[in-house]
Swiss-Prot record:
The modification N6-(pyridoxal phosphate)lysine is found at K249. This is Tyrosine aminotransferase. Its EC number is 2.6.1.5. It comes from Dictyostelium discoideum. Pathway: Amino-acid degradation; L-phenylalanine degradation; acetoacetate and fumarate from L-phenylalanine: step 2/6. The lineage of its organism: Eukaryota, Amoebozoa, Evosea, Eumycetozoa, Dictyostelia. Belongs to the class-I pyridoxal-phosphate-dependent aminotransferase family. GO terms for molecular function: L-tyrosine-2-oxoglutarate transaminase activity; pyridoxal phosphate binding.
Length: 417
């Protein structure tokens, strides 16, 4: 026996699922590559976390609710895997529309919107199936799919048409292995909000091919000016929709990890396919999301709570002013063309590399900018949009102004002579 043991060799390898788990944003933010200029303070406008600079914070009312419930010790145990009934009821009232009424049974509470996305993809697709996702788009869709050995097909967003979906390209990608269309509105990274008519056009494609829609609507409450958000589920009574939402962006608490899947089951299509039972089963894998945060949802999401509504309106106006500053300042930079944002907390900036002596692409632009000016951005290649970069404009005005002045100086330094 001892001889047999001595002849064996250790061979412990990472699983195929783990090897497929590649999130380019986290890889860049967590590990970096380029080093900032040690003589300048680093200004990071790279990650969609509104809490980084401390200028945007959840209202005290929400903190007080949470503290009160912590002290009560009523929510220290395991919640139901799909969420507390009171939390699900609150979400149902919050996301339902006059044409799409919901009850607590139509809500699955998840660990953040990313957890909700994982549930939605996991319940609709099997290994070898394919899902259609936007390009440019949020890399997590592909990362989540690949860990489940689900193939990803990217449908184009048309830059010259305000990043609307290329409907003909979308149609061309559909085959017998296509099981869902994922639509992100308002959009990360583009910062655009789709019109009602364009959403109806997308829904028509889904109806033609009998494909359910996963609607990532996490930024639904962050729209600017006259740009109105339309929940996709409010625009159809034929196409079944899994709508993704959460409190991370509206309430500035991404670390609280609270999201949801809202099930809009048209003609019992999901029920007949046991989709609801499947979501419940998948939710049981993590034994339910944060119990304490769930406990405050009835008051936090109450549509009649004017205190919360006024605070949310103030935050949105603040972000809108930051977006305007971004466009106003960076429009003056040599070789840069900002894309006007109609919502979210993101701005895409187009780079004309022909204007520079020694910058070939967005990767080089972002890398050299960090090394010389200590301003950290994400290159568009991360989102499948080369020769752009994304700015997160949540920082205080003084920090944004300083960062943009450095970017303008950088563009002048590298200007083609």
């Amino acid at each position: 026996m001892q001889d047999n043991v001595s002849q064996r060799k250790w061979n412990v390898e990472s699983s195929k699922s783990a090897n497929n788990a590649f999130n380019p944003i986290r890889r860049i933010v967590d590990k970096g590559g380029f080093k900032p200029n040690p003589n300048k303070s680093t200004i990071s406008l790279s990650i969609g976390d509104p809490c980084v600079f401390g200028n945007l914070n959840i209202l005290d009312y929400a903190n007080d609710l949470l503290i009160e419930n912590i002290k009560s010790s009523k929510f220290n145990g395991y919640p139901p895997s799909t969420g507390y009934e009171i939390a699900r009821e609150a979400v149902a009232k919050y996301v339902e529309t006059p044409t799409s009424k919901l009850t607590s049974k139509d809500i699955i509470v998840a660990s953040g919107a990313s957890g909700a996305i994982e549930l939605a993809i996991g319940v609709l697709l099997n290994e070898g199936d394919n899902i259609l996702v936007p390009k440019p788009g949020f890399p997590l869709y592909e990362c989540t799919s690949k860990t489940k050995f689900i193939n990803v097909k990217h449908y184009n967003l048309l830059e010259k048409q305000g990043f609307n979906v290329d409907l003909e390209h979308l149609r061309s990608l559909i085959d017998d292995k296509t099981k869902a269309i994922l639509v992100n509105n308002p959009s990360n990274p583009c910062g655009i909000v789709y019109s009602k008519q364009h959403l109806l056009d997308i829904i028509q494609v889904a109806r033609e091919y009998c494909l359910p829609i996963i609607a990532d609507e996490i930024y639904s409450d962050l729209t600017f000016g006259e740009h109105k958000f339309y929940p996709m589920a409010s625009l159809t009574d034929k196409v079944p929709i899994l709508s993704i939402g959460g409190i991370a962006k509206r309430f500035l608490v991404p670390g609280w990890r609270l999201g949801w899947v809202a099930i809009h089951d048209r003609d019992n299509i999901f029920s007949n396919g046991r989709i609801i039972e499947g979501l419940i089963s998948l939710s049981q894998v993590i034994l339910g999301p944060n119990s304490l945060v769930q406990s405050i949802l009835p008051k936090l999401l109450d549509p009649q709570n004017t205190q919360v509504k006024e605070w949310c309106s103030t935050i949105t106006k603040t972000l809108e002013s930051h977006s305007k500053l971004t466009v106003d300042m960076l429009s003056k930079a040599n070789g840069l063309k900002p894309v006007c944002s109609s919502g979210t907390m993101y701005q895409m900036i187009e780079i004309d590399c022909s204007k520079y002596e020694d910058i070939a692409d967005d990767n080089e632009f972002v890398g050299k900018l960090l090394e010389e000016q200590s301003v950290f951005l994400l290159q568009g290649t991360v989102f499948s949009l080369p020769n752009f970069f994304r700015i997160v404009f949540c920082a205080p005005i003084d920090k944004l102004t300083e960062a943009y002045e450095r970017i303008i100086e950088f563009c002048e330094t590298h200007k083609k002579k």
